[in-house]
Amino acid sequence: MMLNLVVADGPRQLSAREKAAKLKKSGLSFAQRKALREEEKKNAWKKEQGGITTTIEDRMKRREQDNPPVRPKPYDKPYEKKPYEKKPFEKKPYEKKSYDKPVASKPVEETDEEKYQRLMEGGKRPEKERWVPQRNFRNRRDMEKAGKDQSQDATPKHHDRDVIGTREDGSLIRRIREKTGAKGGIKGTYVSSIFSEKKEDRIAGEDVQMEDEEEEEAENNAESSNAALKDSTTFSGLGCSQRLVDALVGMQLAKPTKIQRATIPRLIQRERDLFVQAQTGSGKTLAFVLPVLERIMSCDDVSRETGLFAVILTPTRELTTQIYSVLETLCRKACPWIVPGIVIGGEKKKSEKARIRKGVNILVATPGRLADHFDNTEALDLSQVRWVVLDEGDRLMELGFEETITKILRTIEWKSVLRGENYLKDIPKNLKPLPSRRVTVLCSATMKGGVTELGKSTLKDADWVSNDSVEDALAETSVETFSAPSQLVQEWVVVPAKLRLVTLLGALRGDILQSSEKTNTKVIVFLSCSDSVDFHFDVLSRDGSQINKMDTAKTAPLLLDDVSTSVYKLHGSLSQQARTATLASFAKNSTPSILLCTDVASRGLDLPKITHVIEYDPPFSIEDHLHRVGRTARAGQDGRALLFLLPGAEEGYVEKLKQSQQMKKTTYENILAAGFGGKGWDFAATNYHLDVERWVLGDETALDRARRGFTSHIRAYATHIAAEKDMFNVRMLHLGHLAKSFALREAPGKLGKKKDPEKIKVNKDGSLDETQARKKMLDRSRKHVYNSGESAMGGYVLE
């Protein structure tokens, strides 16, 4: 639509402003006016282009002008269509495929002598196999089915049995034996056989042969029925999926241990309670973790919201953290949809509740904190719990968790979906691969009375697995029959009290210098009390720098000049955060590392690559000794352990230890010579001890640590069990020489605080008697009051 304005001089083209005003007054809508403007612009553009081609011929001409045809090249040849020639069909010989099966056999002709020789050697009858091609199948199932049917149809109904004793072969053998050899006749004559030729006897012989073949076939079938367990040297042979096997290979765990080979198939294939008794370092953690993960991985649509399937209870926070670390690594590498969780004392309960609220599938916990969550955390759903694992059962009983564990098991049983007659209807279909009943696993290194009672109250119709045979294991009801790993080398040394400190330093330096791989040397030193740990940590790490800003980890520049060494300390008085960080740093450190600790690190912890264990203070029982030395020589690796003893009655302690293990004696002279450089080791050791004494005298904090370490060591020494009081009697100690081992130059009676020390007195039975010291101090204070009053009143005291 064109809008033109007519004037006196004739029509003229309107300007843009005039056109806009005209359109606005026309009464058209905004959309209509916009369409008119667009149409006008389009017509103007077409006019500038010289018009619009309206016919097909014009368009074709313009296309040819824009795209001229390509001129043929001189080397281009026109395409010539050849007539079809029918070729005669040529039948090619069939090539045997891998899936083809023989359908018929043609026996090879042989003479009587050849057949006799073959039967005597036990060979099979040679045959020529004929193969037929298989048709094209849609899938592998049809191919296998067709091959099976074809092979069954092609089996000959009547065939000769190639076994000595049949009708044809037996007669042939008899004829050849009678005709030739030592039993043959003269000049080709026959010697009559003494065996019967009756038909009944011959049939009976054939029946016996058939029975032998049936028994052999049954034995072969019995071996193949458990083919999954035939290769028990690998995790896949035990029933673990390939995802778990790959994750274990990534963790440098390629072969299972003996206890794992006995435990994993039982927990995967059966639904019975299990008691696992094995020595320390045998791999009990993976023995119950892998079956739980394998069964959960077999379920479909499992996520953190599906529910809690397994609860693992441990006695200590460190062991709980260790098991959780193993679980978290396996789940991250093999099954990231399975979520583990951890609840322990010392952590924020609010954070634990948040993790439980999000959902966990496997929960590792200490009994006390878990019982607290049972009472106060409503989001903790226990309806789908299928496994309850009690690790370190003997330690759980020692710490008094029996009542708490009973409460936990009752709560789980009460809230479980597996209760009632119609419980199977309440189980989701995707959880059918899980056990249909709750499975309880009790793991322990020893069989003490408390563990036996715990097993009776928690296990029902349980199997029992041990490293030893069942007959030997049934007799293991005491710690005397409990042995340390065979690859562990144990030594003991008698050291005078005043040489204990320098001998410890010599042993540490010798272990690091003589180790085949100095960078991987890790030593654990066990002491009797936390104050002693703090003192020796300060001695070894003085002038050292902190590691990762931790107060429990420092470098030890004075220990060795040419080797960078790190020193850590660990005891129960530290906070949970400090203990966890210390263990993690000690485990990951690639330089030579020394961990000074109490018995808090002697149970359950699987610290990697511990090469040496030093028992600087004797253990409080033989069981504690076995758990201490069990920190090394784990999972088949080599390890060494050294026990320090004082001269005299303590030497009899070795006879008790030798009842269950082998120990050899060494001398402190050899240890000092190896640690302080051969010749002149006595002067070097003396100079080092004097240097420590000067440092203690010059530092008030170090002096206080030394005093506290000495007094705490005496108190701890008096806590040995009554059966060992004859060997560890406090009254037999030389307190002056023992104070020397703590770099103290004061007499034992002056080791109290400031001017009024508390003297250490011992009863006849070896226990500490503090009442006498308190009485003397009270008398001294009264005497002081009396003297002060007498001087004030001129020598007289008022009544």
UniProtKB/Swiss-Prot annotation:
Motif DEAD box, chain ranges: 391-394
Protein known as: ATP-dependent RNA helicase DBP7
Tagged with keyword Magnesium: no
Entry note about domains: The Q motif is unique to and characteristic of the DEAD box family of RNA helicases and controls ATP binding and hydrolysis.
Annotated EC: 3.6.4.13
Biased composition (Acidic residues): 208-220
Domain Helicase ATP-binding stretches: 265-465
Residue positions binding ATP: 278-285, 306-313
Keywords from the UniProt entry: ATP-binding, Helicase, Hydrolase, Nucleotide-binding, Nucleus, Ribosome biogenesis, RNA-binding, rRNA processing
Reaction equation(s) it catalyzes: ATP + H2O = ADP + phosphate + H(+)
GO molecular function: ATP binding; ATP hydrolysis activity; RNA binding; RNA helicase activity
Entries under Gene3D superfamilies matching the protein: P-loop containing nucleotide triphosphate hydrolases
